[in-house]
Amino acid sequence: MGRRRKGRDISGWLIVDKPAGLTSTAVVNKVRWALDAKKAGHAGTLDPDATGVLAVALGEATKTVPYVTGALKAYEFEIRLGQATNTDDAEGEVIAQSDLRPTEDEIKEALSAFIGDIEQVPPQFSAVKVDGERAYKRARDGEEMTLAARPLYVDSLLLIDRPDADHVLLEMVCGKGGYVRSIARDLGAALGCLAHVRSLRRIWSGPFDAKNAADLETIEALARTPELDAHVQPLETALDDMPEVKATAEGAVRLRNGNPGMVLASGIEYGETCWASFESRAIAIGRYKSGELHPVRVINAPD
């Protein structure tokens, strides 16, 4: 038998304001230790140099991660005009330059082409797999790859500031799977001036906002204390945008065993995804059919 992972059975969400210079996995490991949590994961990777909202799921909350990663997210990012890099961000080597600088009106006009359902090609330095190997590993070896375009929904893309001729501050709200570096690269190409991302910050992700995030200094200072536990948000927070149905006592027993259970619902369409509660606690996520919830995920959070 494998070794049993030590730690507490704690469930919920700790929202971290990730600093630059750490991987998302490193932040999750710090949170797991600080809370002495048995299980933890995150809802959407941030590049090491990016900052902002990293939603860390604890315990049974990890079962709700797909519903957060699929939600809209907002990013604020600064673009450096006039330079292309091999990584599409400031960490890479400058591989081409341009003296052309577009006007604000030209930038605003170009942004409109990136709104709605678009296709974007991931950066060469990305975690996309090519023949079973991460693209960034091949790129580090000097290989140039043809990566397939991927669909992305962009809800909005706005010009926030133009501090000088070389820099533009943008804010984007988008769906799952977007590469901000690709947006910068493609915008620079569309404007004919080249561009890369200089800085990137995620300001919210689904129901989680940077305004309610804890920084790592605070988390480490409060490690293994009730004060840090007080920062943990309920598991149900991740389900704010999903309709709720209430399980009957008998239905709750059936749902907890992974079987369809009777629920009380109003205005829920047949086949709609929703979550069931019993005594104000989430117990299952599934699809509503004729007065019953057919569970896809069963939640067994500790009291």
From Swiss-Prot:
Keyword Isomerase: yes
Gene Ontology terms for molecular function: RNA binding; tRNA pseudouridine(55) synthase activity
GO biological process: mRNA pseudouridine synthesis; tRNA pseudouridine synthesis
UniProt key word Calcium: no
Active-site positions on this chain: 47
Signal peptide location: none
E.C. number: 5.4.99.25
Keywords in alphabetical order: Isomerase, tRNA processing
Catalytic activity: uridine(55) in tRNA = pseudouridine(55) in tRNA
InterPro entries linked: PsdUridine_synth_cat_dom_sf, PsdUridine_synth_N, tRNA_psdUridine_synth_TruB, TruB_C
Highest taxon listed in the record's lineage: Bacteria
Family the UniProt entry places it in: Belongs to the pseudouridine synthase TruB family. Type 1 subfamily.
HAMAP family, per database record: TruB_bact (MF_01080)
PANTHER family: PSEUDOURIDYLATE SYNTHASE TRUB1 (PTHR13767:SF2), TRNA-PSEUDOURIDINE SYNTHASE (PTHR13767)
Function as written in the Swiss-Prot or TrEMBL entry: Responsible for synthesis of pseudouridine from uracil-55 in the psi GC loop of transfer RNAs.
Listed name of the protein: tRNA pseudouridine synthase B
The encoding gene: truB
